[in-house]
Amino acid sequence: MAELATIARPYAEALFKATTGAGVDPVSAAAWLDELAAIADRPELRQLAGNPKVTADQVFALFTQVLKDAARAALPEMAGNFLRTVIANGRINVLTQVAQQFRALLNRRNGFSDAVVYSAFPMDSAALSEVGAALQKRFGRKLNLAVQQDPSLIGGIRVVVGDEVLDSSVKARLEQMKAALTA
């Protein structure tokens, strides 16, 4: 999906520059951008937006109605303008990538990286903070940790930080032993 990422990059960069230039909190902008991306990921909405008989104003109204139904606050003016631009250009399908790239820009500015910790078993907060401290030392930067359970790992953890992977799972060790024995 490099093509979608290429299409999304200018939108993310422009929105990031606009939010920082206008004094808007980029964290709140990332939050409403995530909400818009979640709405845009709905297949029904994509189908409706792709219908040539449906106008851009109708698609925009649908987004705002979904936000109201979810008891969310009204979109800030900047968010509304951004959404109108995305809809007018027929780029609803890249909102998820725009949100990801916007977060990457925000993380880069703040010296953070997103990290996903895959664990075979649920992790309590004490274990997660211990793992987080070790990972921050290992990767040399602050990390925003997200935990996902993956029973296929058998034991241990697998950490993904950007394009770097640290795999200390039992599954990975078994695969290494299998490769060594069959070589």
Curated annotation (Swiss-Prot):
Cross-referenced SUPFAM superfamilies: N-terminal domain of the delta subunit of the F1F0-ATP synthase
Pfam families: OSCP
GO CC terms, sorted: plasma membrane; proton-transporting ATP synthase complex
Membrane topology: Peripheral membrane protein
Subcellular location: Cell inner membrane
Chief localisation class: membrane
Cross-referenced InterPro entries: ATP_synth_OSCP/delta_N_sf, ATPase_OSCP/dsu
GO MF annotation list: proton-transporting ATP synthase activity, rotational mechanism
Keywords: ATP synthesis, Cell inner membrane, Cell membrane, CF(1), Hydrogen ion transport, Ion transport, Membrane, Transport
Similarity comment: Belongs to the ATPase delta chain family.
NCBIfam families recorded: ATP_synt_delta, PRK05758.2-2
Job description of the protein: F(1)F(0) ATP synthase produces ATP from ADP in the presence of a proton or sodium gradient. F-type ATPases consist of two structural domains, F(1) containing the extramembraneous catalytic core and F(0) containing the membrane proton channel, linked together by a central stalk and a peripheral stalk. During catalysis, ATP synthesis in the catalytic domain of F(1) is coupled via a rotary mechanism of the central stalk subunits to proton translocation. This protein is part of the stalk that links CF(0) to CF(1). It either transmits conformational changes from CF(0) to CF(1) or is implicated in proton conduction.
Oligomer and partners: F-type ATPases have 2 components, F(1) - the catalytic core - and F(0) - the membrane proton channel. F(1) has five subunits: alpha(3), beta(3), gamma(1), delta(1), epsilon(1). F(0) has three main subunits: a(1), b(2) and c(10-14). The alpha and beta chains form an alternating ring which encloses part of the gamma chain. F(1) is attached to F(0) by a central stalk formed by the gamma and epsilon chains, while a peripheral stalk is formed by the delta and b chains.
Protein name as catalogued: ATP synthase subunit delta
Biological classification of the source: Bacteria, Pseudomonadati, Pseudomonadota, Betaproteobacteria, Burkholderiales
